[in-house]
């Protein structure tokens, strides 16, 4: 293998909403995080319910095409291929749960896979991240507190105040 561990991060606008739609369409009861301190869960649920009406097949590829975003199948494909020859960390939260759910339908090596995220996701009382991951696949979750509450930079400190919480692989890079 060219690497001991491939770390895959993501950052996509609206990603928690498309992730929620994919998770629900694939049969997982998910409550997802938000990049905002006040999670607009009701709005997300309305959008997802509307999107789910477009689904006309239970085939995973059709589901992702109808309600997902391009990141989900792209990263799931990377996971499927790379986990056969290397360790892979999905560095992220809600969106990586959707990647894992899709990958569980197309195949990947669970033994070489881990989720790495921030404690801002795993400690969020409004979501079921840890339970959700356990229902999707038998992969470990690594959760880290990046200590951003002590940052002198307001943009970084905002993560600890409920903004963003994860993104661009933050949990996996710490």
Predicted regions and their residues:
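N-terminal loops that bind phosphate or other acidic moieties
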Residues: 1-9, 13-174
